[in-house]
Amino acid sequence: MEQSHQNLQSQFFIEHILQILPHRYPMLLVDRIIELQANQKIVAYKNITFNEDVFNGHFPNKPIFPGVLIVEGMAQTGGFLAFTSLWGFDPEIAKTKIVYFMTIDKVKFRIPVTPGDRLEYHLEVLKHKGMIWQVGGTAQVDGKVVAEAELKAMIAERE
């Protein structure tokens, strides 16, 4: 049953995120949710450290966090927003659902992200109908836009 969960808490820590998102190391790219308004917007972040495995090859002696992983982090954040907007914070329902990418549009990378950065994802709902959600927004470091994208996803049953 689809319903709106307007009274959700606005902050979620890693132990909460792990109960909703199925991603795990090394692909969980959200450390904390710092603002959430159901059916509207979300702000989350990932701390970028030199210890990320990806820096072994991207690039030696010039570590830059890959743009595709920035977009994936935005998608995970949008998936958290969509799921909790529909079902609230419900780990039992989360075990039965999965969010799939459908489209990635209007992606632009503006500034490289490097170790030591706090990568913030700022997303808002552009539209949704049933299990199909479209979100758009930016990734930021120190208030500067480092990337932007529009993403469409669907929530499906896990098999």
From Swiss-Prot:
InterPro entries: FabA_FabZ, FabZ, HotDog_dom_sf
Entries under Gene3D superfamilies matching the protein: Hotdog Thioesterase
Family designation: Belongs to the thioester dehydratase family. FabZ subfamily.
Disulphides: none
Keywords associated with the record: Cytoplasm, Lipid A biosynthesis, Lipid biosynthesis, Lipid metabolism, Lyase
A single BP term in Gene Ontology: fatty acid biosynthetic process
Gene Ontology MF annotations: (3R)-hydroxyacyl-[acyl-carrier-protein] dehydratase activity
An example Gene Ontology CC term for this record: cytoplasm
Catalytic activity, as annotated: a (3R)-hydroxyacyl-[ACP] = a (2E)-enoyl-[ACP] + H2O
Function: Involved in unsaturated fatty acids biosynthesis. Catalyzes the dehydration of short chain beta-hydroxyacyl-ACPs and long chain saturated and unsaturated beta-hydroxyacyl-ACPs.
Entries under HAMAP family matching the protein: FabZ
CDD domains: FabZ
Catalytic residues as annotated in Swiss-Prot or TrEMBL: 58
Location, primary (coarse class): cytoplasm
Source organism superkingdom: Bacteria
Major enzyme class: lyase
UniProt-annotated location(s): Cytoplasm
Coiled coil ranges: none
Listed EC numbers: 4.2.1.59
Protein name (Swiss-Prot/TrEMBL): 3-hydroxyacyl-[acyl-carrier-protein] dehydratase FabZ
